[in-house]
């Protein structure tokens, strides 16, 4: 009985190494995926905050497009995000709602998946709308 138990343990010695070799790439892929999803979520949150700050500035002051774009770039630069496009739509004087719209776009660079030779970018966009506060 003792001899068969010892031979069973010796015959299963390499199983842990083989199982680890099979599971490790999957663990790496999952951890890289979680990291990239977190980075994309953070970038989207930064774009939303930048659009919100820009539309706040445009809503409480006279809609000055260069000033709004500068404010949006300031928020994005603080978080090391490079916006590819900033669109400011001033309020229409004939519209009773007088809404101001700011849209910010950026390309998200996928970093971790370069191991799999995917070097693409994912376009992200955030839009904020507020009513212009004027008398």
Outline where the language-model segments fall.
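Alpha-helical assembly-interface signal, strongest on the long, hydrophobic N-terminal helix that forms
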Residues: 2-72
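Short, conserved structural patches
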Residues: 2-3, 52-135
